């Protein structure tokens, strides 16, 4: 709408300037005293004025001709796909399609008596059509000349479609990241749905036209296709026990401030070498919530040793060592392990020392739930989590032990601050790595990446739509799009390619792509974004060197992107597509010329003529329409 408004205002501004010039010209003639000049002026002025304002109708006619050409091209394609050979039947099919295509333009009248569809000797369907455009200005009566122009302006178009046309597969890759919110997303939906009508034709025989839609943000949501593309995540093992202590707790009645400090605890029952966890002490609080080794003095007292990183050393509880005086209370509990960490029992857990685990659904010891831990393997059925559970409650039943490695249902990792984080596997995917990173090799031979998304940068709800000729299904998906997340444009680019690649047909057998054959199949990928690609991955998690806008560092993994910068990955993928003869169009919505985003889009596109940088919603619609027309022209002869 903004583009049309600007064009109309441009015409009126031109008319205004012409009017000022005419006024100045008239003033000069008014001062002219010679009669013949005044007479000529009086006769010519009305003509000059009407010619000036008639430019409005000329502009409208030009716009209508573009719309008529689009409608006639589509109608001719429909006639060419029909099984008919007589002009009568071809005209019946073509006119029906043309009438439907022109319903959006109520101000024009189709001249059916001057619309023809015929088949020539070279099996080319030839169509000609005219419409009448009602004039707004130029039908004024000009005494003594009469009407300056008729009430209607005739506008014509011509189209030819070779019946040996091509099948069409188009992938539409759409940026639905957080920056696309508000009016941008509204504009995108309008433009994308208009493109669907241009590309996907109602008649699918003898040649088909199909479109896939790939919404992307932090990744591409594959929905039910995810397991087949990146593998089924490893599930959990059931937990049957979790404990860290043995025996009863023993009350503390005193601790001296000495080196070593002596603990008084009547009938404590501890032996030298036992490990204990001390808590609840008042006054000398510095000793609380720590693991110690016991040195027995007698049945009522013992001293403590602490692990210094290499050995057990005497605990000095003097004031000079930072300890306050004991006042009351406290308990000591005997531990199963030297660090007093929780031992989890899960048959066949499959974990090794230094692996990570995520625990959930434990009853009783509920404090252990919802966190990731680094483990020490004890046996094939037990492991410790290197953390004490004194405040977590006592285990009663149940629980799930999830491996935390790449490929598991949960990814447990350390972030750049070395804190342990845990994220669930989503149905989104990340980039493929290895030798097939920039090819369309089948996912059966080279899996794509898992995606572990966090709650502040989530997997988009809209999932991928493989090739379809159902315009309602395609438009419903477009209408459902919502914005959120950062920009993994390289992943969207990859899946644009994959949806038109026959190597991925095993994912969607009923929506598979045709075998590449330039004679009867045209493939195109349209990549749309509004900014920088900023979200590469390492081991399924956003890499620590991801660019600004990719989320906070808390939920990034402490390794750099395996495949490098998102832009570099996108460029390599585009090169791979173009090498196969796939036509690549790029659309940078409100992307500044000269920016890094504009540069990569230009490099990705098949040529400079295939790269667009629309600055407004109206410009975006115009860009998509231009792409749709270009794709259509590749299938028709004129």
What is each of the regions a protein language model found here?
Residues 2-17, 55, 59-66, 71-135, ...:
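Short amphipathic secondary-structure patches
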Residues 25-44, 120-171, 180-184, 497, ...:
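Acidic, polar low-complexity linker/tail segments
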Residues 39, 70, 169-174, 211-215, ...:
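Structural recognition of the beta-strand scaffold that forms the well-ordered cores
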